[in-house]
Every structure is written in C-alpha cells, then in structure tokens.
Amino acid sequence: YYDASLSFGRNGFDYGLNHSLNASLGEASPTRFQLGDYTFSQLTANLDATRELNFGMAKPAYLALGAEVRRERFQTRPGDSASYQIGPIEAPSGAQAGPGLQPADAARVSRYVAGLYADLSAELTSSLYASAALRWDRYSDFGSAATGKLSARYAFTPEVAARATVSTSFRAPSLAQSAFSFTVTDRGEGGVLSQVRTLPVSNPI
C-alpha cells in the first residue's frame, strides 16, 4: 500500500492593545497600539509504503517505510513606534500593558527538515506482539538525529496483558523559540536609559 500527502498550514497572531497609553509621551500618546505581528507557516510532503512480510508465523508481519520533507517559516513584524517609544516625560515608557516589538527585533527565518522512518511489527506468538521503529531526521539548522523505539505486549489471558516500551527521542526548538527577540528600554536611576533584551540563539552575545 502506498500513501502520499501534501499539506500546508499557516498561523498568524496580530497583537494589538486598546484603552492604554504610553505615559512618557504625555498628551501626545495614543490610546490604541499595534504591538506586533507573528506568523508561522509549514509545508509538509509525505510518502508512506506498507506491505506484509511472511516469516512463516501464524500471522504476517507488517513493514512500514516513509519519507517526509518539511519547510517551516517564522516571521515577526514590529509594532508602531508609540508602543515602545521613550518620550520626553520621565514616566514608564511603552504601552502600559507591555511595550511593542521594536524594528531591531523583527525576525524572518526558515528551515528545512528531511526525515526517513521505518516500522516493523508482528505477532510472534498468539500471546506476544512486538514492534520496532527507527527514524532519522536532518534539520538545516540543527544537524541530524536518529531515534528508535522497541515495544512489546504479552497477553497472559484475554483479559490481562502487560505492555513495555523503550525509546529515544529528539526535539529541536521551534523557530518561534530559537528566533524570538524582544527589547524593553526604560529609564533607570537618574534617568539613565537601559535595555533588557531577550535574544535569539543566533545572536553572538
């Protein structure tokens, strides 16, 4: 049996704020702010194949093979300047519920992931079922990783059974985690400006 699929998904978050102000701008402050935009999209292509294998057991074994290619994209856009601006008045700057995303923190990143996987399962006896799976993934930004899983189920009676699984795993950070950047600029003691930053993993600092 063969199965092929192509799927696309997109998620967008438009971050805005109403009925607030930037106190450091005084009367010039708007009461409505655009704090930033966040967009993630994913395009995935899959090809799977399954067949029966006869090893002389009471029931055939099943072998599944597959390949996957995935493209991921993440983008952020800055908010309007009043949402993070430091005005002439010595008061908290930025929109009061939280400042907007600054232009220096805008991100546009993408990556590609290619994967191969295989799964073999069989009823070894009338009471024992076992399966083994292997997967290999190659990330354009994180390198490659191989994982595996072994599972078994033994039925003592039709009503009572024991199951065991051992596996390894790997999860690369999402693009939203690794590429996110955020800056808060405010006045410290004596009116001195200071910045607190959340930096992406690509930042040399």
What label would you give each PLM region?
Residues A4-R10, L63-R71, L116, A132-W136, ...:
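Transmembrane beta-barrel strands of outer-membrane/channel proteins
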Residues S110, A114, D137-T147, S169:
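Solvent-exposed loop/turn segments connecting transmembrane beta-strands
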Residues A155:
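An internal, acidic/charged active-site-proximal segment
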Residues A82-S83, K149-S151:
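Short, solvent-exposed amphipathic alpha-helical segments in soluble enzyme
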Residues F8, H19-Y129:
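Outer-membrane beta-barrel transmembrane domain signature of Gram-negative proteins
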Residues Y2-A4, K59-L63, S126-A130, A146, ...:
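Outer-envelope beta-barrel architecture signal
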Residues Y1-G9, T31-Y38, A161, V201-I205:
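Short intrinsically disordered, low-complexity coil segments enriched in acidic
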Residues R10-D14, H19, R71-T76, D80, ...:
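Surface-exposed extracellular loop regions of Gram-negative outer-membrane beta-barrel proteins
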